[in-house]
């Protein structure tokens, strides 16, 4: 597949995952039984992990193809995304927190970490949607 097609496919995959993630926030959690609420919250964080992975990989491909920079890690990809002017410093800081929190969630289950990360999920959702908008506007043709 040509690079532009590969990039569009990665962005589309990210968009689809992010749409599913966003849908999990459309319901009033107070209406559900605590067991159901817990299951939904776990699903939200699982989709958060998946979306954050797709996000940085799409960013890495963009940076490689358009800016001729080869980030070695998720943090490097986000740093170069910022250095190339795609995002502002506030978005950069939030994206670094997204990566840190994704790592916390994927390595151990700890209820305190779960609660801490969940408290930031609204802010993360906003920035992840901002990144999608940026990725959709950029072409690597």
Positions of predicted regions on the chain:
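Solvent-exposed interaction patches of small proteins and small membrane subunits
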Residues: 1-141
């Amino acid at each position: 597949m040509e690079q532009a097609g590969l990039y569009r496919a990665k962005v589309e995959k990210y968009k689809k995952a992010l749409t599913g993630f966003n849908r999990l926030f459309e319901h009033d959690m107070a209406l559900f039984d605590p067991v159901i609420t817990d299951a939904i919250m776990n699903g939200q964080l699982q989709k958060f992990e998946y979306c954050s992975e797709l996000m940085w990989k799409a960013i890495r491909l963009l940076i490689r193809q358009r800016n001729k920079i080869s980030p070695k890690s998720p943090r490097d990809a986000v740093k170069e995304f910022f250095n190339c002017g795609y995002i502002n410093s506030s978005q950069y800081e939030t994206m670094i927190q997204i990566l840190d929190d994704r790592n916390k969630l994927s390595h151990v289950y700890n209820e305190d970490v779960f609660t801490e990360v969940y408290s930031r999920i609204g802010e993360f959702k906003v920035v992840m949607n901002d990144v999608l908008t940026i990725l959709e506007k950029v072409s690597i043709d």
